[in-house]
């Protein structure tokens, strides 16, 4: 018992054997139970702070889901501690806000890379280092989304630390910087904005892990500003199913490659 307590990860309260090699990472602890319901033989493992963990199987392979909370700091903690006890393949699934005018509410965005407009990743790699998703996972996510018939956008997402820095930039003392950079993201064709992928991609590279991300588009403030059709879409079940189906593809690929 004493040894088990010593080995327990500080934040996620898990020990080696509690989680699988493959982990889905939502932000919201409240989504973990419904994600675990898509596994076989799922059971609850632990919950502490923003971290809610379930483990089950997919295609006979041990898999887990662990929520990360909001933003890079808590997401990086989850990845670090999960990696400490054996995880090496991660899929972030969650929500985003569209930026590119072609990205509409209810669509799926698969991130190929992320703008490091956050600071967690700075403690892992210099700013010149890109935050890039694992190619195999990215391809699997896109394949899974298209197989579901979802309108799918693949490209770069923007990651920030301050939610209201995006949504209320004019009131911020550094509004001049926020607004100018937002205009740059638009002109560069950035697909959407969210808060975790840049940190997760860089941390995964530092740990020699694999990570990809897919998102459900809730809203696109740029479409609203342009007077285009726009509605709120809060049902994230499609993005969750995309992540689970993609994980099955990765498991099959790993078996074929004997990874």
Model-derived segments and spans:
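Metabolite-binding pocket within alpha/beta catalytic cores that recognizes anionic/polar moieties
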Residues: 2-140
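Glycine-rich beta-alpha junction loops
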Residues: 29, 97, 158-164, 199, ...
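Flexible, glycine/charged-enriched surface loops at secondary-structure junctions
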Residues: 42-47, 149-156, 252-259
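Short acidic/polar active-site loop segments enriched in Thr and Asp
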Residues: 88-89, 191, 210
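Active-site rim beta-loop-alpha module in soluble metabolic enzymes
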Residues: 131-189
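Generic non-transmembrane alpha-helical segments
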Residues: 140-148, 203, 242-253
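Zn-dependent metallopeptidase/amidohydrolase metal-coordination segment
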Residues: 198-232
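His/Asp/Glu-rich mid-to-C-terminal helical/loop segments that flank catalytic regions of hydrolases
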Residues: 221-259
């Amino acid at each position: 018992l004493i040894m088990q307590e010593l080995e327990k990860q500080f934040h996620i309260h898990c020990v080696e054997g509690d989680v699988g090699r493959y982990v889905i990472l939502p932000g919201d602890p409240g989504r973990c139970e419904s994600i675990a319901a898509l596994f076989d033989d799922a059971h609850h493992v632990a919950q502490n702070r923003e971290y809610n963990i379930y483990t089950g199987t997919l295609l006979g392979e041990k898999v887990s889901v662990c929520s990360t909370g909001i933003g890079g700091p808590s997401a990086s903690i989850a990845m670090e501690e999960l990696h400490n006890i054996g995880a090496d393949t991660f899929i972030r699934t969650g929500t985003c806000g569209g930026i590119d005018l072609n990205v509409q509410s209810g669509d799926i965005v698969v991130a190929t890379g992320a703008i490091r407009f956050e600071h967690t990743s700075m403690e892992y790699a210099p700013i010149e280092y890109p935050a890039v998703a694992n190619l195999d996972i990215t391809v699997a996510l896109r394949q899974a989304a298209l197989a579901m018939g979802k309108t799918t956008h693949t490209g770069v997402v923007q990651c920030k630390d301050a939610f209201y820095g995006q949504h209320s930039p004019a009131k911020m003392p550094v509004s001049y910087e926020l607004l100018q950079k937002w205009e740059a993201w638009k002109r560069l064709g950035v697909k959407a904005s969210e808060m975790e992928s840049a940190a997760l991609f860089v941390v995964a590279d530092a740990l020699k892990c694999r990570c990809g991300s897919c998102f459900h588009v809730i809203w696109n403030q740029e479409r609203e500003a342009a007077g285009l059709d726009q509605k709120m879409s809060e049902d994230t079940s499609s993005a969750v199913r995309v992540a689970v189906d993609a994980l099955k593809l990765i498991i099959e690929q790993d078996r074929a490659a004997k990874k």
